[in-house]
């Protein structure tokens, strides 16, 4: 197994609006700018990494929600049109991304050895989520580095709306009772 090191990490905001505002050729809608603060942040990030050697970009996307295990993209290439379900008039992005399947498999296998439920996504028609695409584009608009894309497993924290409402009510009632005693 090849060994490497993590050379950088970041928490990357990824609303599709920032891709829209940049007007890349891959995105069908055209904007007149906007979202400068976030776009400038990504520009600074890219500048800070321009002399750093790295082989892949690892993205854990909160918008690729899985409920049975954590999934990893498991094919060398994914390409399609991604249309944001909430902002279809802002984000219609033609993506063509390469995946570091070897690294994804190594991470998958380590997670499996640790007892996590994991799966490799090998459906060639799988539509990659906009959070991954936005982060990939803003981080490296040339798309010349492969990605390792990891889903956000929601099974340990998924509640129905009714359960969440009940939890909020119980928490609020408990807080009010505590405040009354103080």
Language-model segments: what does each one mean?
Residues 121-172:
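Glycine-rich phosphate- or other oxyanion-binding loops that anchor nucleotides, phosphorylated ligands
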Residues 61-64, 123, 176:
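Short, well-ordered beta-to-alpha junction loops that form the rim of enzyme active sites
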Residues 174-182:
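Single conserved hydrophobic/aromatic residue that forms the stacking wall/gate
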Residues 96-113, 117-130, 145-148:
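A charged nuclease-like catalytic/ligand-binding cleft shared by nucleic-acid processing domains
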Residues 47-56, 109-118, 141-144, 157-159, ...:
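Secondary-structure boundary elements
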Residues 64-66, 156, 181:
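Glycine-rich nucleotide phosphate-binding loop and flanking beta-alpha elements
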Residues 2-110, 114:
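A short aromatic-anchored loop/beta-hairpin motif
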Residues 100-101, 160, 180:
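Helix N-cap and loop-to-helix transition residues
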């Amino acid at each position: 197994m090849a060994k490497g090191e993590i050379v950088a990490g970041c928490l990357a905001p990824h609303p599709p609006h920032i891709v829209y505002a940049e007007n890349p050729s891959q995105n069908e809608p055209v904007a007149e700018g906007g979202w400068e603060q976030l776009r400038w942040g990504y520009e600074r990030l890219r500048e800070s990494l321009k002399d750093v050697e790295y082989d892949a970009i690892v993205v854990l996307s909160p918008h690729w929600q899985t409920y049975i295990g954590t999934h990893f993209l498991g094919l060398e290439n994914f390409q399609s049109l991604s249309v944001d379900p909430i902002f279809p008039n802002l984000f219609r992005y033609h993506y063509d991304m390469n995946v570091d399947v070897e690294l994804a498999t190594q991470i998958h296998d380590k997670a499996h050895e640790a007892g996590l439920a994991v799966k490799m996504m090998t459906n060639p028609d799988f539509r990659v989520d906009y959070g991954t695409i936005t982060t990939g584009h803003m981080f490296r608009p040339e798309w010349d580095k492969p990605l390792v894309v990891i889903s956000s497993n929601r099974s340990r924290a998924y509640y129905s709306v009714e359960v969440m409402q009940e939890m909020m009510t119980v928490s609020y009632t408990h807080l009010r009772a505590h405040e009354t005693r103080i």
